[in-house]
Amino acid sequence: MMNDFLTEDTKAIILLCGVFGKDRSEKPLSLGEYSSLVRWLIKVKMRPGDLLQKDTIHEASMGSGINKQRLESLLGRGVQLGFAVEEWKRNGIWVISRSDIDYPVRYKKHLKNNAPPLLFGVGNRSLLKGDGLGIVGSRNVDQAGELFTRQVAEFCAYNRMPVVSGGARGVDQISMNATLEAGGVAIGILAENLLKKSVERSARQAIADGCLLLLSPYHPNARFTA
């Protein structure tokens, strides 16, 4: 069932970079460490999924400079990942990685090696491929700012332009709600609580109608700590 939900590449990337389960004995790879590993994979013409074969781990360790035991421990979390996948599926959460065809091209183009290795999402996945207008701003917006935000978001809805925002209180949430209320579509790029946000009453129907996509590079239960 896991193979129907994840590609082999994404499975390997989650094992290496993902936070799940109760075992914290080995720290998942940082973005920099994963990028170093990717450079080695490209050099030897291999893919992340190839690391699921134990006979490749020694070479990967030597080529990337990442401790072999750490790689083995992270890649050995298959049982824990299986439980996590079942929970994500129950809650309508899907996962894509930088190696997947659905991964946003703009992320790779503009962020390059800094593009998140993983993206967790809920909702209309096809919205990843379209255009959009970013609307972000203060959490404590005044009345004039709120009115302007609503006008711009409604204009986007009428012109079939998705609104892309952060989903936080204030301008972000106002813009997303306004475009949805006007019959448009919205994409929320979240820094925390993807799961919690996806089950809120205001989001559930829009997700079911295919009008809302919630996306996060962090674990679905992660909280914002900055």
Name the predicted role of every residue range:
Residues M1-R24, R90-N91, R98-A226:
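Glycine-biased, small-residue-rich flexible motifs in mid-sequence functional cores and linkers
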Residues M1-S99:
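Short, small/acidic-rich helices and loops at N termini and domain boundaries
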